[in-house]
Amino acid sequence: MKEEVQKKSSGAGKDAEIVKKKNEYLNTLFAAMKIETKVTIDYDEENCNMVFDLEGPEMGILIGKRGQTLDSLQYLVSLFVNIESESYIRVKLDTENYRARRKDTLENLAKNIAYKVKRNRKSITLESMNPYERRIIHSALQNDKYVATRSEGEEPYRKVVVYLKK
């Protein structure tokens, strides 16, 4: 695994050490998965953000079905990064610009579903989504005059319902 670190903050702190320690963790993780990966880290110490951009020939495997594998890896990396951190660091793991593409897809889905709800005058329940994806749907339709959204169900099966406003 290759690693590049870009640091936006010039301050040195204990959090900066985490950037170095994560290298061993990710090496072990990707070696176990038998995936060759180049990792670029964008670490903004001032805003407590760490973005891991992954590149390699088999990134589809890391993304998984609807990003579930990528979300799981992000969770594991976040746990590892924050174990020794003085302050909480927000971790984002991305590859092939997947997160932005998924956001665009969900925003388009929200608009299409809103159109169908208006046309058919019936509520539509979407498939189960993680909290981040549900938030994208809610945000995409929050300013619509004719439809509203709500989440129903229990995790991990919570779904967004798009319905006509009364």
Language-model region placement:
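RNA-contacting regions in translation and RNA-metabolism proteins
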Residues: 1-166
